[in-house]
């Protein structure tokens, strides 16, 4: 997959790493047929060009969406007919929707584009591997992971987290333009690289507590990166640019917020002490809570360990730690970075900059 691009991880800048498509797709025949779409968010009023202006210009020029940029309506919700027309214009076969005016959710948008890339079998492989390990995956686990490995999702800047959308919220035409523009420019070699790396995904035999922790963590794959976010539900975060310094945002997480949600905010039945292990909310604080002698070296990590990444790799100090995640096993972990919450192979930058881990289960006196 190569070295990742520069991206936002937990508030600091780090280096991040043809078949007929059904009218509906997660990774099975028609999983969204009875889905309840979340209420559309209130339009975000901002002056100036859309955040997706370059991608809007790209898809308009390519004939995928809209007759011209001036009439594009970026903040309007996307319909299934519009998505169908765009996929067909890309040259991908796609069945016409039976309910063309129905709004497309974010997770449906991601799934449809993963299918258009020919990677629905890969997405299914991820979900089935997680299910085989007893992790109770959501039906969007595979498609949301593959969409992010392809680079189809983005992160809105700090202070504009209200533009983010959770999986069941309606997709805007701007979000669709961004993803379609990325898909249109994907080199076949990138698609093949994603197919090959997904083929490596597997989960080792897990202990009961590892299974419970990872089941919870994987439930959030597909949620957006929200700076200071700690919940899958709508939340209010502090923002220097918002009225009263309070900004209403959708469900989503930053990197340490995901770890905080998985281990801290909802005690596990039979293990109330696990919620007491983490004391500090930030990655910096979490990484520094374990003495140097108690740090888990990269070669000894186990499922459900919390991973810490720093600019100096294993030589990093707590002050140099800027990212965190939760190890799943067999070279994969789950984290929230610029594309949102996803499964990620421990390769490239992530392998180079993995500093150490801590084992909350053991710290709470629990066996795996």
What are these regions (language model features)?
Residues 24-53, 61, 65-80, 84, ...:
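Feature responds to low-complexity, polar/acidic, surface-exposed segments characteristic
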Residues 195-257, 261-272, 318-320:
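N-terminal capping segments
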Residues 203-214, 260, 268-347:
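...with weaker cross-activation on analogous glycine-rich loops/strands in unrelated enzymes
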